């Protein structure tokens, strides 16, 4: 029988999907790694698994122990599901501004959810810093251990992509990948995949796709962390160099406005049947830019990070989009003209 022994073995080995319309428009083969097909429906399942396994190996976490994390949602979902499968509880600290869909999913997965005001990283009450203090507090009372996942600075996150995502991309493209592009939240995916691909062929181009409001585009182009503008995307956009980003082999950086990313998301759903989230729009826009820079005939890979249904109240809400002065696809408000044949 072909089977996977439990949810843990179902993480990873996701397919590469050719994105037909952007491939045709650029003359390149643009491929999306379908990370929404992981059990927790996002790329963050990989980081969750490696972070938990690392804590277990170090003896910091035993069955019945608690995993604490500050997250915009997807990492928390991954930690909760992997934790359930391995016998751990999860406590998630989340900015109250995150989508209701993510909050509901975290609760559905059994996580204890703590919502806090959204403040910058410099503020001591930033959600990440609160989660760190909470982990230290719980470690004093939890007999089976309480660990802070610390996805931003725990390099077990990056190692998950060095060992799995990067090699998968290399093997799936028969070693012919020319470029890899994605946005940064913790930095684990971009750095880990970049390191894995560069180790196999140094000429592979590694590109950062940065949303407005983040500071990394400025850092990788001028050496100064500086942000401008804003974005409705969630879970990406970083204002500092995390431990996962240290020594990341980034060759080029692009700054992507929402007005460039969102039409790609809507087009992908309408014409190719893929419903993806905002960060994936940033990723695809970055892939298009790299494809245009390299020229026709190249193979570019990016990350399809999660499902768009996780952002339905914002990303696919006409009123919200208009409020933010962003494009609204006509089909989103289409009314049926079909007459129902009642008897």
Language-model features, listed with the residues they occupy:
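PLP-dependent amino-acid enzyme catalytic core
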Residues: 1-343
